[in-house]
Design a protein with these regions (language model features):
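Interfacial catalytic loop of ABC nucleotide-binding domains
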Residues: 4, 37, 54-56, 171
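ABC-type ATPase nucleotide-binding domains, specifically the catalytic core motifs of the NBD
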Residues: 7, 13-34, 47, 142
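Signature (C-motif/LSGGQ) region and adjacent switch/coupling loops
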Residues: 12, 52-56, 169, 183
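Conserved ABC ATPase "signature" region
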Residues: 33-51, 79, 160-161
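Conserved ABC ATPase signature
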Residues: 56-60, 64
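P-loop NTP-binding/switch modules centered on Walker-like glycine-rich loops
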Residues: 77, 82-86, 90-171
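Charged, flexible cofactor/metal-binding loops and thiol motifs
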Residues: 143-228
Length: 228
């Protein structure tokens, strides 16, 4: 499911024809009527009217385009859906609708979902397991509930500290000093070390990054496991 549904469609070809093109490529033996029926089923699944197939992309709202992108992603019967920031540029109400559609389709078809996002609230709602990444490397991975309740890596804690809470008194959100590293050059040791608030105490910034299991199904970068 593409990052920006606004730019995912060819502007001069109707939505239905673009989905039929994918179906023809993957299922060359399908008849035209079979493909039309498949598109109708997909549109019903994501909450779109059949008439959307005969419209051009500019005739659809942002939310409708994103629903159509989800239908396109499902058209070839995948086992895994990769959703890359699928609610970018949509208002909050439409975002919630799209997320509900993705969850509904996931449960209906029994799909695995890889959801890529910087939105902590969405990750908490949509996932069973999470992998926190920094500078292209996974620094912590495990069950969502466990990591939210007991974050171990300094970057994971910093992410959660930067998210406003609806509970308790208002307080100033924390931020990290410095900037993310350039990925052009090879990084020796821990890529988070220059910004890590624990680098002088509990971390080992010279250790090359790799995951170690600290609890059942809970993995964290070895750099954060002390100066041993």
């Amino acid at each position: 499911v593409f990052h920006g549904a606004m730019n995912a469609w060819n502007p001069v070809i109707k939505i239905g024809e673009q989905i039929r093109e994918a179906l023809r490529e993957h299922y060359p033996d399908n008849s035209k009527q079979t493909n039309i029926q498949k598109i109708q089923e997909l549109f019903k699944m994501v909450g779109l009217d059949d008439t959307v197939a005969d419209r051009y992309p500019h005739e659809l709202s942002g939310g409708m385009k994103q629903r159509a992108v989800i239908a396109l992603a499902l058209s070839c019967d995948p086992k895994i859906i990769i959703a890359d920031e699928p609610t970018t540029a949509l208002d909050v109400v439409i975002q919630d609708q799209i997320l509900n559609e993705i969850k509904k389709v996931q449960e209906l078809l029994g799909l695995s979902l890889i959801y890529i996002s910087h939105d902590i609230a969405v990750i908490a709602e949509m996932t069973d397991k999470i992998a926190v990444m920094y500078a292209g490397s996974i620094v912590e991975m495990g069950p969502t509930k466990k990591i939210f309740e007991n974050p171990v890596h300094s970057y994971t804690r910093a992410l959660l500290d930067s998210t406003p809470s609806i509970r308790g008194e208002k307080k100033k959100l924390k931020s990290l000093d410095g900037e993310p590293p350039s990925l052009i050059n090879k990084i020796d040791g821990c890529s988070f070390a220059p910004r890590c608030p624990d680098k002088e105490t509990s971390c080992n910034p010279t250790e090359h990054m790799r995951l170690v299991e600290i609890a059942p199904d809970h993995f964290v970068d070895i750099c954060s496991q002390g100066k041993e």
